[in-house]
């Protein structure tokens, strides 16, 4: 229906011409009897339940693991703090020549002990909730527990107080990633449309920069305690999963500070 559609123009587009094209091509679309305003959720918030799915495939040379907690929705005030938290732990790939020198503390641990081929943290938001976690690939099947253990220990460290230096570094990396990604009309149009559908408004690059700059170490500690500390996790694993320990053993690492 027309109320579920967003038409965006970016670049050298005349507003009047865009309106004429919209009337020509989309004026026939029906309108819902009870239209939902953009950015509003018509359903009850989803409930996150900790669980796991493992698919063993011994023909694979690697084990692929995703671990996530419930994250922040698009409209949550914790949206940007959770993105900064994701940036603190970052991504790592052993194929990078500078991988042992990357600023993420977790990358040093993984690189030094050859625990994984790569890892990537993510913060995925939806209209009512989100997923925050990590995706890991490893061919070191006998040390999967170490990889998971040290990853979750780093998560818990954020709950006790991240350093101001790593928070500032993560904020700079996040701003560069978000703002430099708007490098063309296609990316800008996609960004405008996504924000309008999910939040009902568009945050300008300046507003995004202000929101990220306002995140403090205390704010990171707060969201880490809210979303990570002793929270249930969802695990999905495929490949050589025989070295991945029991769910309850992994879940216990969400509330212990023992290295």
Briefly describe each language-model feature range:
Residues 6-78, 91-96, 237, 241-259:
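An aromatic/glycine/proline-enriched structural segment found at the starts
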Residues 88-92, 96-115:
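M16/MPP (pitrilysin/insulinase) zinc-metallopeptidase core fold and M16-derived inactive scaffolds
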Residues 7, 67, 83-85, 134, ...:
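Buried hydrophobic packing residues in well-ordered domains
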Residues 16, 38-45, 50-51, 67, ...:
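Acidic/histidine-enriched segments that form metal/cofactor-coordinating
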Residues 6-8, 173-259:
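C-terminal regions of mature proteins
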Residues 92, 116, 120-185, 257-259:
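M16/insulysin-pitrilysin zinc metalloprotease superfamily fold
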Residues 49-51, 113-121, 216-222:
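Short amphipathic beta-strand starts and helix->beta connectors
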Residues 1-3, 58-61, 124-130, 201, ...:
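Short, flexible turn/loop "capping" segments at secondary-structure junctions
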């Amino acid at each position: 229906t027309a109320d579920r559609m967003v038409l965006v123009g970016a670049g050298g587009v005349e507003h009047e011409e865009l309106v004429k094209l919209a009337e020509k091509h989309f004026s026939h679309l029906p309108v819902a009897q009870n239209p939902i305003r953009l950015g509003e959720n018509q359903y009850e918030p989803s409930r996150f339940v900790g669980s796991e799915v493992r698919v063993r495939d011994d023909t694979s040379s690697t084990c692929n693991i995703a671990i996530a907690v419930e994250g922040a929705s698009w409209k949550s005030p914790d949206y940007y703090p959770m993105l900064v938290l994701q940036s603190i732990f970052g991504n790592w790939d052993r194929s990078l020549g500078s991988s042992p020198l990357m600023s993420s503390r977790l990358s040093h641990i993984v690189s030094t002990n050859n625990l994984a081929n790569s890892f990537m943290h993510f913060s995925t938001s939806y209209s009512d909730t989100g997923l925050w976690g990590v995706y890991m690939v490893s061919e070191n099947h006998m040390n999967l527990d170490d990889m998971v253990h040290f990853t979750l220990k780093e998560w818990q460290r954020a709950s006790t107080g991240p350093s101001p230096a790593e928070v500032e570094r993560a904020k700079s990396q996040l701003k560069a990633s978000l703002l430099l990604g708007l490098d063309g009309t296609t990316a800008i149009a996609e960004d405008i449309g996504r924000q309008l559908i999910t939040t009902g408004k568009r945050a300008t690059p300046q507003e995004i920069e202000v929101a990220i700059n306002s995140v403090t170490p205390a704010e990171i500690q707060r969201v880490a305690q809210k979303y990570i500390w002793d929270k249930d996790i969802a695990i999905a694993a495929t490949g050589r999963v025989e070295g991945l320990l029991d769910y309850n053993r992994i879940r216990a690492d969400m509330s212990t500070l023992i290295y």
